[in-house]
Amino acid sequence: MGKRVFMFPGQGSQYIGMGKEFYDTMPNAKAVIDLASEQTGLDIPALCFEENDKLNITEYTQICMLAVEAAIYQAIIDKGITPDVTAGLSLGEYGALIASGAMTMADAFAVVRKRGIYMQEAVPTGGAMTAVLGLDPQVIEDICKKTADETNSVVSVANYNCPGQIVITGEKAAVDVAAAACSEAGAKRCVPLKVSGPFHSAMLKGAGEKLADALESVEIHDIKVPYITNVTADYVKSPADVKDYLTQQVSSSVRWQQTIERLIADGADEFVEIGPGRSLSGFMRKINRDVKVVKIDKLEDFEKYVNR
């Protein structure tokens, strides 16, 4: 028997109108988004469904993404479809925690609201992220280390997304130097990302420390569905470890490709991307084309999947 994975995307896939069909037609999905509003004091439906300038600002993006992911997840499990294992990219790890049973939706919403604020506050001026396409990971790591040492500044790998796509992060000048070196070393392209800061770098450690304080009062429950953390690309065995990984995750590399490869090695053969956009499905095509990938963003996707 194969295994079904529920996987949850990170920020960057948000769009106005995300989740609206579920909110309008499914009472339980609506209740989840309304719970997010209650837990945060924000009008989540207005942020998600109405034209506004806030949805792309980190402190709002994160909670809105998680609310929609959790609402779609609720709609799926209401149909009796459950995961055998779960994972999420960066912010999406909180969706995975909900699906694993380790964190309640209410707690996840409250924590992620704070996470978004802390990450927004911690964003220093002069940070940047760049996607490096078509270069060996070890070469990129070596270039980042050499650049960091020579310039006495921060630059490192933020995301191992899929073969041929790695994101580097850090101080803008150092990221630019490293990107130029990657191009010289044979990278097909280096694409600066439109982000508000150097996420998943040492420059975000302050946000991680604040997050650790916020997590102190949160109860972590038994892990009922196995889940893999970005930090190690391995299963989290003990509830006691969850908070440490969530704290580290803010300033650590996201090992997404390694996570997916581990899941496939362990027998996973159906991957269900739950939430806005199709970024994870795109990565899957480059990691392994032989496994089944399902994208559930719109109501049409949902109905096709549950009625298959």
Residue ranges, per PLM feature:
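FabD-like malonyl-/acyl-CoA
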Residues: 2-140, 270-299
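Cys-dependent protein tyrosine phosphatase-like superfamily
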Residues: 2-5, 221-229, 235, 241-252, ...
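Alpha/beta catalytic cores of group-transfer enzymes, especially the acyltransferase/condensing modules
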Residues: 11-13, 38-40, 100-251
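Short, flexible helix/strand-to-coil boundary loops that buttress conserved ligand/catalytic motifs
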Residues: 48, 144, 179, 284, ...
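Glycine-rich phosphate/pyrophosphate-binding beta-alpha loops
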Residues: 61-63, 198, 253
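Non-catalytic positions within long, well-ordered alpha-helices that form the structural scaffold/packing
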Residues: 77, 183, 264-267
